Amino acid sequence: MVPAMAAAHDNATRTAPVIEDPAVWDDNAEQVLSALEKQFASYGMTLTAKEGYPYLLAVNNAGGTVTVYTVDAATGRYAVPFMAMVCSGGADTPTGYFSTPVDYSWRLLMGPSYGQYATRIYSSYLFHSVPYYSQHKDDVEYDEFNKLGTIASLGCIRLAVVDVKWIYDNCPLGTPVVIYNDKENPGPMGKPGTIYTDPADTEKRGWDPTDPDPANPWDDSFESGTAIRSQAAWDQWEDEREGWMKSLTPTDLQGWSTDSKIEGTRG
């Protein structure tokens, strides 16, 4: 088992991952992406890579999975499965083809609640962490964390901190995003598992287990989360750890948000 797949299995303490054979990832991706390009042609969707934008984010709302595709150097098209991350969307999550316009280290959400490493997709819909009761990293809504992988949000796309921070750090504003629904097929790499946080564990329950903050009481092994990574993604994870730690939001307070009003933001 390659390291990425081993991590996906070992960290999945709530639901087990369903991982497709890496030998068929590319063929699976061709089928999925071809269908999406046709389905969302009226939105202007194209698989031709945008210069300066190495990734396409494909959100399968019904399947609870975000699959990241990178560029096939031979064709210049988004085609290569890079990583799959478990997510929670909502009944009101829109489908379509979009590009990201703005991001926030912390973002005030409906409730009110707060999300880390938020990136706007379209209108009031964002990628963000599982919501927090307050703008403190030890105050996550732990019951909501245990819903990852299911329909649970008010329309935004929730992810574990490790995954949403990857988007925040690696996907420049303007990154293409397609949102669709396919309950039967989560994506070409499969569907990642999920981590269980015990509501009775008062020491750990307030933390997202994957938050790389040194104050996190969870074991460091959970930092890689449950994402299904290609070897290229796993190599990136190892190579970029130093920079990854440098971009942490403050443990206890206020990250910067340039647009922090509740109106127009889901959860």
Feature roles, as predicted:
Residues 1-15:
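Sec-dependent signal peptide cleavage junction
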Residues 4, 8, 39, 248-251, ...:
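Low-complexity, intrinsically disordered/propeptide-like segments
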Residues 9-10, 20, 59:
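Intrinsic-disorder/low-complexity regions
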Residues 18-44:
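A general sequence property marking short-to-moderate contiguous segments
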Residues 30, 75-76, 190:
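Intrinsic-disorder/low-complexity loop/linker signature
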Residues 35-140, 238-239:
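Gly/Pro-biased beta-strand-loop elements
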Residues 107-267:
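Exported/periplasmic cell-wall-interacting domains
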